[in-house]
Amino acid sequence: MKFSAAVFAVLAATGVSAAPAAESVNMMAATPQWTIRDAKRYCRSDDSICNWKFGIDTGNGKPYECRYDVKGPGASKKRSAGPSTCGDFTITSGWSDQFGADNGFTTLSVVSKSKRQIIWPAYTDKQLAGAKIVKPDQSYTPASLPK
C-alpha cells in the first residue's frame, strides 16, 4: 500500500513537470532605431511649467519636430504627465527618484500611432539642467505594441 502511494505521487509529479513551457514573443520591432534629436527642456523659475522641444527621427531622413509641455506645481519632477499629441506621435512622461533625489530622471513615452511602436527615451536631471540641448543625441530601438 505504501509502495503504490509513493509510485502514484512520483508519476503525478512527473506529469506536471513535463508540461510544455509557454512560448514568448519578441516585441522589439524589426525597424531602424529612432533618434531623439536636440532634446531640450526649459522650466520656469517657479517650476510651474516645463517646455520640451525635440525632434523624433524614425530613420526616414527627416526628424519630426515636437513640443511637449508639462504643467503644474513641481513640473520638472512630475511623476506623470501627458498625453500630448505631436503629429503621428503621442507623448507622455514621468519623473523618478528611484536612485535618490540627486539622481532623478525623466522618461518619455513616444508612441507612433500609425506604426504601433513605442520608445522610452530617458534623461537625467543633470542632462536637462540649464535648458541646454542634450548632446549626443540618443537612439532607441522601438518596441511593437500588442495588437
Per-region residue spans from a language model:
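Short, surface-exposed binding/anchoring microloops in extracellular/periplasmic proteins
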Residues: 23-74
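A generic structural signal for short, solvent-exposed coil/turn residues
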Residues: 10-12, 28, 46, 58, ...
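A generic structural micro-environment signature
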Residues: 7, 42-45, 62, 92, ...
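Acidic, low-complexity intrinsically disordered segments
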Residues: 75-147
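Fungal secretory targeting signals
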Residues: 1-23
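Short amphipathic alpha-helical surface micro-motifs
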Residues: 17-21, 33-37, 47-49, 88-91, ...
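Extracellular structured ligand-interaction cores
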Residues: 13, 49-51, 105
